[in-house]
Amino acid sequence: MKASDDPLELEPVLDTLPVGFDALRADALAEGFRQVERLAADWEARTTRFDRDGEALLAARLNGVLAGIGGLTVEPVVPGALRMRRFYVRPAFRRIGVGRKLVTALLAGVDGDRSITVNAAPASITFWESVGFNPDPRDGHTHILSRESV
C-alpha cells in the first residue's frame, strides 16, 4: 500500500496492536478523545478485532512513526452498511494526508455499493465531509457515504 517514494506506509493490523500504539493512545487521551482507548479495551477483550467480512483496521506510519489508525466495521444499525471507527491521527501528522489515505485505503477494500457511516466528532466534521461523507444524523451516526454515488 506504499508508493516507493511515499514516506507514508499503511499496514493492516491483524494480531497485535501496532508498535507505537501507547504513544498514539496517550496523544488521543491528552486531547480528550477516547476512541483509541476504546479500541485498546475492545481489542484486549476480543470484542472488536475488525475481522468480520468487510472489516479492516489500518495503521499509518510516516517515516516509521505511528501517525494514525482507523478502521471499518459492520454497521450494527444500518442493514448492509459498514462504519468507519476508531479513527485518530496524531496532531503532529494532521493536514498532510494521513487521514485521507487511511479512508481511501479502507474504502478501496469495500465490495459493491455498500453505504458507509461515521459518528464524527465535532472537530472532525470538516474532514469527513471533505472525503465525501454527507450529514445524516440518525441511527447513531452523524454522516453517511453512499457508495452508489462514488
Report residues per predicted region:
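Conserved acetyl-CoA pyrophosphate-binding loop and the N-cap/start of the following alpha-helix
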Residues: 92-105
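Conserved GNAT acetyl-CoA-binding A-motif
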Residues: 110-121
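Active-site beta-strand termini and strand-to-loop segments that position acidic
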Residues: 61-63, 147-148
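Short amphipathic alpha-helix that is part of the acyltransferase structural core
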Residues: 1-45
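Conserved acetyl-CoA-binding loop of GNAT-fold acetyltransferases
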Residues: 129-139
